[in-house]
């Protein structure tokens, strides 16, 4: 089945989106919502006409250096990692958390627990769940009680995804503290949430996007500034 949609921007600009086949990969895509339609359509991000790559902000080496610095900062801030655990926000946050875990193991000689939470606006059947992101799955095979939980995500934007992830952690127990580590902070917060560890701060406009790419999901490593 093929879907046809139009991505309606706040400015009222209509941008046609190419159809997405059933067999198309969802690994590098974009949810497009039709106001009043009650449905969301998943469309390949590179099929959206008018979205262009404006600049490459970080290459593979820069991403690696940023993650290593974040790993050192997490260990230093917490005076070691004996009581630290990592929780990645799927999908790229989970992958970044695993990389930070491996870095910390090389630095401190300890392998910290690492889990994930799945935060989304939509069910797999494309029906909108909520105006705010909700947690559909939490995979924590360890206790968070009296631990310092470090949430990991690729891009920090409004703060709503981070808030949903924090709520999921709190439902699993009472941690000593919750910290937030992100590869890129692009600003435009809608909630009073601030990252404790930031790989790179990138001020953006509302017509710009930050796209973090990882080989596990995108076939390459890098951070790109996209423009609508």
Sequence positions of predicted segments:
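PRPP-associated nucleotide enzymes
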Residues: 2-9, 13-16, 25-228
């Amino acid at each position: 089945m093929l879907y046809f949609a139009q991505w309606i921007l706040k400015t009222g600009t209509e941008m046609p989106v190419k159809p997405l086949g059933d067999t198309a990969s969802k690994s590098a895509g974009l949810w497009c919502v039709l106001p009043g339609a009650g449905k969301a359509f998943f469309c390949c991000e590179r099929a959206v006409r008018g979205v262009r790559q404006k600049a490459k902000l970080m290459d593979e080496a820069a991403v690696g250096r940023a993650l290593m610095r974040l790993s050192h900062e997490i260990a230093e801030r917490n005076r070691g990692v004996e009581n630290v655990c990592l929780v990645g926000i799927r999908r790229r946050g989970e992958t970044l958390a695993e990389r930070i875990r491996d870095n910390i193991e090389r630095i401190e000689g300890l392998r910290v627990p690492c889990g994930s939470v799945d935060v989304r606006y939509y069910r797999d059947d494309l029906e909108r769940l909520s105006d705010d992101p909700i947690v559909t799955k939490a995979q924590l095979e360890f206790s968070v009680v009296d631990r310092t939980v470090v949430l990991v995500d690729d891009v920090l934007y409004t703060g709503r995804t981070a808030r949903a992830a924090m709520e999921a952690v709190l439902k699993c127990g009472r941690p000593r503290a919750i910290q937030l580590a992100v590869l890129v902070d692009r600003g435009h917060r809608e909630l009073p949430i601030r990252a404790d560890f930031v790989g790179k701060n990138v001020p953006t406009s509302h017509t710009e996007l930050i796209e973090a790419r990882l080989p596990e999901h995108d076939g390459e490593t890098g951070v790109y500034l996209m423009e609508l």
